[in-house]
C-alpha cells in the first residue's frame, strides 16, 4: 500500500513545522510519509529539538529545507502552520487538499528565558494535540 504524503509548511522550517514533522512521524507514520519545509530555511531551532526531546521525540537529524516543488505536487495534504506561509505559500494543485492550522511562533516569544521556554513547550503540545486529533479523526 502506498502511503499518502503530508507536507507541513511554515515560514522558516525552524520550529513549528519541524515539531509537526516529529509529531507527524509519531502519530501518522503508518499511513503517511511526513515532510516539512519553509518559505525560507532558517535551520532547526535548538529549542525545538530540546522541547521535542523532552517528550521522547528526536528531531535532531531533521533538516531545515525550503519548499520542494516536486514534493508539493506529490503531497496529498499540505498543512500551513503560520500566517506567513498561508499568505505566501506557492499555489498547490487543485486536486490537493490544503489546510491551515495556526500556531504562535515560539522563536518570537518574548520575556525571560523561562517564559520563552514555556512558549516552546505550549506550542509543542498544541501541535501534538492537533496532529493526534487528525490521526484519530482524519480532520
UniProtKB/Swiss-Prot annotation:
What CDD domains does its record include? LMWP_ArsC (cd16345)
Which cysteines form disulfides? 10-82, 82-89
Q: Which GO terms describe its molecular function?
A: arsenate reductase (thioredoxin) activity; protein tyrosine phosphatase activity
Which Enzyme Commission number(s) are on file for it?
A: 1.20.4.4
Q: Which GO terms describe its cellular component?
A: cytoplasm
Q: What does the record give as the reaction this protein catalyses?
A: arsenate + [thioredoxin]-dithiol + H(+) = arsenite + [thioredoxin]-disulfide + H2O
- The UniProt entry annotates the active site at 10, 82, 89
Judging by the UniProt lineage, the source's domain of life is Bacteria
Biological process GO terms, please? Answer: response to arsenic-containing substance
Q: Which InterPro entries match?
A: Arsenate_reductase_ArsC, Ptyr_pPase, Ptyr_pPase_sf
Matching Gene3D superfamilies: 3.40.50.2300
User: What keywords are assigned to this protein?
Assistant: Arsenical resistance, Cytoplasm, Disulfide bond, Oxidoreductase, Redox-active center
Localization, per the record, is: Cytoplasm
EC top class, as a word: oxidoreductase
Function noted in UniProt: Catalyzes the reduction of arsenate [As(V)] to arsenite [As(III)].
Question: PANTHER family of this UniProt entry?
Answer: ARSENATE REDUCTASE
Checking NCBIfam families in the record gives:
arsC_pI258_fam (TIGR02691), PRK13530.1 (NF010053)
Q: Which family does it belong to?
A: Belongs to the low molecular weight phosphotyrosine protein phosphatase family. Thioredoxin-coupled ArsC subfamily.
Q: What is this protein called?
A: Arsenate reductase
Species of the source:
Halalkalibacterium halodurans (strain ATCC BAA-125 / DSM 18197 / FERM 7344 / JCM 9153 / C-125) (Bacillus halodurans)
